[in-house]
């Protein structure tokens, strides 16, 4: 899902049907320096189950904010959140790093019972483990519809930016949390408007991650229906 391994300054953008988070950072090795960050409401009907719709409308809203706050990076990184994204933990033989991708792609249909021609596969190496006396590599494998990824590339083009990489929200959460938790078993829940990512860590390693297609909007709608409230009266 990566397009170019950009270093230096870039814009990081997270989009859902509730808000857009825009952050300008400088990457140097494993370190990142945050220069500025802005959150704005998402235009209506521009985000549908992870797919960017009405690209021109969305690009215009983002450009206005970037110009106002003087963002000047030329590269963009997207973090995708979609109920259509699936993840699975898998064990593979202890092969060299440059052999992992080929092995994952070859076995993708065993991980996910979908038409792989319509999906893009990405993986994250979690740890090396011993399984039945043999050393193996534990991976977190993600499958995201090509339609979703392509819509983000279309947005980048409309913004006049070059795609540095496209990641999925679960991996972004994992990369942050593994630096902040200890060896104890930890449950990390990331609740968004229309989806929730559940993570279980042990010994600072991700053991399980699942995307649930239910979020804050379901709870809000239930409260509104039960008590006859309007959305403007509910503070989320």
What are these regions (language model features)?
Residues 1-234:
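Hydrophobic/aromatic-enriched cytosolic interaction surfaces used to assemble or bind macromolecules
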């Amino acid at each position: 899902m990566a397009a170019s391994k950009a270093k230096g300054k870039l814009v990081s953008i997270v989009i859902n049907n509730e808000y857009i988070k825009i952050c300008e950072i400088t990457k140097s090795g494993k370190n990142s320096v945050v220069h500025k960050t802005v959150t704005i409401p998402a235009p209506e009907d521009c985000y549908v189950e992870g797919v960017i719709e009405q690209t021109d409308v969305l690009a215009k809203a983002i450009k206005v904010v970037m110009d106002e706050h003087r963002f000047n990076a030329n590269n963009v990184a997207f973090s995708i959140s979609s109920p259509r994204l699936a993840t699975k933990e898998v064990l593979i033989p202890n092969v060299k790093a440059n052999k992992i991708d080929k092995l994952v792609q070859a076995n993708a249909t065993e991980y996910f019972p979908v038409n792989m021609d319509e999906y893009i596969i990405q993986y994250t190496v979690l740890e090396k483990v011993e399984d039945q006396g043999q050393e193996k590599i534990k991976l977190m494998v993600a499958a995201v519809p090509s339609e979703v990824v392509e819509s983000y590339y279309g947005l980048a083009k409309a913004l006049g930016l070059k795609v540095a990489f496209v990641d999925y929200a679960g991996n972004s959460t994992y990369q942050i949390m593994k630096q902040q938790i200890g060896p104890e078993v930890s449950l990390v829940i990331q609740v968004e408007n229309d989806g929730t990512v559940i993570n279980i860590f042990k010994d600072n390693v991700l053991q399980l991650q699942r995307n649930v297609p239910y979020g804050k909007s379901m709870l809000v709608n239930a409260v509104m229906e039960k008590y006859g409230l309007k959305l403007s009266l509910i503070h989320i």
